[in-house]
Amino acid sequence: MEESARCSAASHIAGHILHRCDQSDASFCISLFGGLKNEPDFLPLVLPEIVAAASCAAFFQIEGNELRPRQVRSMDDLQRGAMNVWEPKAHCPSVPVSSLDIILVPGLAFTRGGLRLGRGGGFYDRLLAHPDCRARRIGIAYDLQIIDDIPCEPHDQRVHQIITETGLIDASPNG
């Protein structure tokens, strides 16, 4: 995908994320991600508005083989961490997994049924399988990342919805 098309798609994705947040309860906690070159770069477009609208905006600190949510209030609370992704700085307070209402989930590919192809580390699968995780799982992808089939293992966790540049897909195990 060319840079101009990627920027345009990221802008549309940002708009869909903000629209989804507008439909959420007044006090919600959302986790975000960003940083890898081939991922939609929506972060600068949504973070200020999400921080203003949400009761909590969180990013994940990689600790061992786990993702630990921490609250951020601006881009100043972020730094490049493991794998060059945005991570919260040490001063950012921890957020219990049970407090997360929405988790934006990256992936290399998704199916309309909510299956996700990650990068092989299992970080998001472990997070989403956490017994305290009751959050709405929303995959973030470009349209070209929506494919027909992904091999599935018992530990793989599905997303409930997928946001692309053209809108929201309600994931269904039969879809």
Q: Predicted segments — roles?
A:
Residues 1-98:
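N-terminal active-site beta-alpha-beta segment that forms phosphate/nucleotide-binding
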